[in-house]
């Protein structure tokens, strides 16, 4: 998450200034930064160029979706009772607000999931930083039918 925050915070700087900031990091941090540097995509590119579990920044205009069918899936939450651990399946729609992030040029959209407890995303052009995750329609699916961005940070673009 540190890399996402850093990349988003320096995103408005020109490449020269970005390089100066990155050069100030010690060697270990520079290696970590280069290894986990986010991929920057448009919503229209996310399905074809996105990589599952990769740090990603997507730019577009979010629109809160009310459709519960767009975001069918579950997250397994471990529950410990004494020495016994069981898992509870929680519907993703219960813990996330789901947005369609629209591409200005092609009007294509990509799903992003934003924590329900957080402030709503503005309906204006923003950069959303997070991790790409797979969205399986059911747990028996081998390959995910869709991807979504689990949003961690966002920044308005003027």
Which residues does each PLM region occupy?
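OB-fold and OB-like single-stranded nucleic-acid-recognition modules
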Residues: 1-158
